[in-house]
């Protein structure tokens, strides 16, 4: 036993016990007990201090010094005025922060201040402007299990938006797809349901916020239960219930184009694996308002299935096409984020400059209304209510853009609004002039050149003299404070001026705070009108963004297909084209799909030829069409698609113990179990994750199945199994390929889609240009030649029948013939057929 370390340990715990027994640490521990899952920001003067385990966690994340209080208690601290930066970093690390403020001494003569938690900030409940990105929503999800259904709410507390929906416990893919679209920063579940959700595969690596207060679930409407959970969490985190969420929108099945999580990721709609640039959202986001940017992202993730909505958007665009957009764009740049301003007003987080932003927005909105009325654009804003708000604010607000960030740090109310306020300001200004004058006179009277009159919040106004000259201070100076290098004094005249200044400041603070609160309350009376105004602004910004993309990229207006066919002429990939280097042009391609004879395209061609790009551009054109946008094509006639599936690429899911092939089959199964006749399906290399014959058999069987349907979903099936092109003899299947040009020892990928089938895969050439060593490439070419010649020999020698022709029987004995005649080919899978054929071969070889 190490006696020295034992003694040290005992000494440490003794010191820690003593340190925790102080009045302040007792107060900290009492508050911390009520907020165990948060990092407690404990206000002490101009700092927020963190203690014990909170300090260890925070210091590690924030990279700040960890010290010890009274040699035992771990602690770290941050300046109160720069807390937002630190809070942001803790939120990004998934932490919750409890803000504990100090107010007044607990009792007369006590040095211990009263402290209370005034706000709990969690990743999903942020409304503070400095902690949010203007163009991104910040969602929180609440999940609730009731019988065989999972009800879920998605809410953005910063904008007040709420979305409700439900899924069957057997239909979790839709829940996962919705969560992938919204990307909630925080997911909340009731305590009694935590285990159920934690055991679901998708949530295994997710941290939940457990809602401790169980809501009575007797209500028939489970959405009411979700509403109660949301409001309870608001009360818990905001410490009051002022924050109000808006009327929820129901995410009903069939209203929007359904896309699963793989499709959202594969198409890189709003983000990709590396960044948030080079996505569909990033290349045609020309919005100028925060609301417009958020709305554009929502509409990309939720394309419409209602043609009436699309026609309405097109009608608005047709009006704007006849006008000059520049004045509208200029006006939109003056708009503030009205949704979040209103939320801050409700949550006691408003800033003086929010009123200026509100005024500018209303002023620009009124001008826009006047201009848009001239061209009969339906810009439906509540003009009279907006004018009332504007007049009310203008009567009070200080003119100019130099309003203080925080109330009390500058002029908020205009001169002339309140006589009492003007007098107090004048007294304050005069008092400060008197201070300067007094300093000059005292320097002259005393002859002390180090004399200065200063101010701080703790001591107030004081005369400061260096220690070297302090003994020469006049007798009428009263000592106030001793420092290492100076002495601080006061005098009757200074105290008189100080009272004048402080009384004036107190009057100013009281009047401005009272009027500020009154202005907030008045604005909130018009919340509904302001939110309606915000929606109209967002929609106008969205429409102008689409028109800007049309002009910039040369996109065209698609037409609605009446016969459910998909017809794209010279279509292009919007993102690839927009990000090509100068001088390069995207090679366009055409495609036609219907639900009968041209429903399923088997697409062949070498790697790098452009198969995946071709499929993605079809999907992206379809999405652009269903949000009401223009599309990159020469002409386009597109149907309303209810579900869009992509199976493009796959990787191991190691955490779930799933191989690449298993992931691929899960995605394929999801498509085949959920498609409808109005779906668009894009398969890329199905079956490549297993052996050649297994993979080919699965791909073959899928195509056979899709062909057998009376109404076939529109499908592109990209493959390297050239044998699958033989299936074009089946109904609904046809062949497409990516054209190539062989030139000496080079292969040119022409990127052009043609009707027919590819002759080669050019895999060895791709290996060569990728840098595979020359001896390996050369040997691979030899082996390929050998294998292909043997393949031909086998075909010639064996004359093997296809799966769809009856085999020749002249060399078979009667028993073999009888066995073949008994086969029910229509009930056999390709794998079963190949296995049976292999058995017959073995029998024949034995006979020979």
Swiss-Prot record:
Origin, by domain of life? Bacteria
The record's listing under InterPro entries reads: DNA_mismatch_repair_MutS, DNA_mismatch_repair_MutS-lik_N, DNA_mismatch_repair_MutS/MSH, DNA_mismatch_repair_MutS_C, DNA_mismatch_repair_MutS_clamp, DNA_mismatch_repair_MutS_core, DNA_mismatch_repair_MutS_N, DNA_mismatch_repair_MutS_sf
Concerning SMART domains, the annotation shows: MUTSac, MUTSd
Q: Which GO terms describe its molecular function?
A: ATP binding; ATP-dependent DNA damage sensor activity; damaged DNA binding; mismatched DNA binding
Binding residues annotated for ATP, in chain numbering: 605-612
Which Pfam families does the entry link to?
Answer: MutS_I (PF01624), MutS_II (PF05188), MutS_III (PF05192), MutS_IV (PF05190), MutS_V (PF00488)
Output the Gene3D superfamilies linked to this UniProt entry.
1.10.1420.10, DNA repair protein MutS, domain I, MutS, connector domain, P-loop containing nucleotide triphosphate hydrolases
Key words of the record? ATP-binding, DNA damage, DNA repair, DNA-binding, Nucleotide-binding
One of the GO biological process terms: mismatch repair
* Recorded GO CC terms: cytosol
- Family membership: Belongs to the DNA mismatch repair MutS family.
Q: What does this protein do?
A: This protein is involved in the repair of mismatches in DNA. It is possible that it carries out the mismatch recognition step. This protein has a weak ATPase activity.
Q: What is this protein called?
A: DNA mismatch repair protein MutS
Q: Which gene encodes it?
A: mutS
């Amino acid at each position: 036993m190490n006696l020295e370390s034992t003694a040290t340990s005992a000494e440490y715990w003794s010191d820690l016990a003593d340190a925790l027994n102080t009045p302040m640490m007792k107060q900290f521990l009492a508050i911390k007990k009520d907020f165990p899952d948060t990092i407690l920001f404990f206000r002490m003067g101009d700092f927020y201090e963190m203690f014990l385990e909170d300090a260890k966690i925070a210091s590690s994340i924030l990279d700040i010094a960890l010290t010890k209080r009274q040699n035992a208690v771990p602690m770290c601290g941050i300046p109160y005025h720069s807390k937002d930066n630190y809070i942001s970093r803790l939120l990004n690390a998934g932490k919750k922060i409890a803000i504990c403020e100090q107010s007044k001494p607990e009792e007369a003569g006590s040095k211990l201040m009263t402290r209370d938690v005034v706000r709990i900030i969690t990743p999903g409940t942020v409304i503070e402007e400095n902690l949010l990105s203007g163009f991104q929503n910040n969602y929180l999800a609440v999940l609730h299990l009731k019988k065989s259904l999972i009800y879920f709410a998605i809410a953005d507390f910063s904008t007040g938006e709420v979305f409700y929906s439900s899924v069957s416990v057997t239909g979790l893919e839709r829940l996962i797809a919705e969560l992938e679209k919204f990307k909630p920063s925080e997911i909340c579940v009731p305590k009694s349901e935590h285990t159920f959700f934690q055991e679901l595969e998708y949530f295994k690596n997710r941290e939940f916020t457990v809602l401790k207060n169980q809501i009575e679930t007797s209500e028939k409407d489970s959405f009411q239960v979700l509403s109660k959970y949301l409001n309870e969490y608001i009360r818990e985190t905001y410490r009051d219930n002022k924050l109000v969420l808006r009327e929820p929108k129901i995410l009903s099945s069939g209203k929007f184009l359904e896309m699963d999580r793989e499709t959202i990721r594969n198409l890189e709609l709003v983000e990709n694996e590396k960044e948030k640039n080079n996505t569909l959202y990033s290349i045609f986001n020309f919005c100028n308002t925060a609301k417009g940017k958020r709305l554009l992202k929502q509409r990309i993730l939720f394309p419409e299935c209602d043609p009436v909505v699309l026609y309405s958007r097109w009608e608005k665009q047709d009006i704007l096409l006849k006008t000059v957009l520049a004045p509208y764009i200029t006006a939109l740049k003056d708009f503030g984020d009205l949704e979040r301003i209103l939320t801050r007003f409700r949550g006691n987080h408003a800033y003086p400059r929010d009123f200026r932003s509100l005024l500018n927005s209303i002023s620009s909105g009124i001008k826009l209304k006047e201009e848009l009325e001239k061209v009969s654009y339906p810009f439906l804003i509540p003009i009279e209510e907006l004018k009332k708000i504007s007049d009310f604010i203008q009567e009070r607000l200080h003119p100019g853009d130099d309003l203080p960030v925080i109330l009390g740090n500058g002029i908020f109310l205009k001169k002339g609004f309140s006589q009492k306020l003007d007098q107090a300001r004048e007294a304050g200004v005069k008092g400060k002039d008197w201070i300067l004058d007094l300093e000059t006179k005292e320097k002259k009277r005393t002859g002390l050149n180090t004399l200065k009159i200063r101010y701080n919040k703790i001591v107030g106004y004081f005369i400061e003299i260096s220690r070297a000259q302090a003994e020469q201070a006049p007798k009428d100076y009263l000592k106030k404070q001793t420092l290492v290098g100076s002495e601080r004094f006061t005098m009757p005249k200074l105290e008189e001026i100080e009272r004048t200044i402080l009384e004036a400041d107190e009057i100013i603070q009281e009047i401005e705070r009272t009027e500020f609160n009154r202005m907030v309350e008045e604005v909130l009376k018009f919340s509904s009108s302001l939110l309606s105004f915000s929606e109209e602004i967002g929609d106008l910004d969205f429409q102008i963004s689409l028109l800007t993309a049309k002009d910039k990229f040369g996109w065209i207006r698609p037409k609605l297909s009446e016969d459910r066919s998909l017809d794209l002429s010279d279509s292009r990939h919007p993102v690839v084209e927009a990000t090509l280097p100068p001088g390069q042009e995207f090679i366009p391609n055409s495609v036609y799909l219907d639900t009968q004879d041209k429903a399923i395209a088997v697409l062949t061609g070498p790697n790098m030829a452009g198969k995946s790009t071709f499929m993605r551009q079809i999907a992206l054109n379809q999405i652009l069409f269903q949000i009401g946008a223009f599309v990159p094509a020469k002409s386009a006639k597109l149907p309303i698609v209810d579900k869009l599936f992509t199976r493009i690429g796959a990787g191991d899911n190691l955490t779930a113990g799933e191989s690449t092939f298993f992931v691929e089959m899960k995605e394929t199964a999801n498509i085949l179990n959920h498609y409808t006749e109005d779906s668009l399906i894009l398969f890329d290399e199905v079956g490549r994750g297993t052996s050649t014959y297994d993979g080919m058999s699965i791909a073959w069987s899928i195509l056979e199945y899709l062909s057998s349907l009376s109404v076939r979903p529109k499908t592109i099936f990209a493959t390297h199994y050239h044998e699958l092109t033989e299936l074009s003899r089946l109904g609904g299947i046809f062949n497409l390929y990516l054209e190539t040009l062989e030139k000496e020892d080079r292969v040119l990928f022409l990127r052009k889609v043609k009707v027919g089938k590819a002759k080669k895969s050019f895999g060895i050439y791709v290996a060569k240009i990728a840098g595979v060593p020359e001896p390996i490439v050369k040997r691979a070419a030899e082996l390929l030649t050998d294998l292909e010649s043997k393949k031909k020999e086998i075909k010639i020698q064996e004359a093997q029948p296809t799966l769809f022709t009856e085999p020749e029987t002249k060399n078979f004995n009667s028993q073999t013939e009888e066995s073949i005649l008994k086969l029910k080919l229509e009930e056999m899978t390709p794998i079963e057929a190949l296995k049976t054929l292999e058995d017959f071969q073995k029998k024949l070889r034995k006979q020979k």
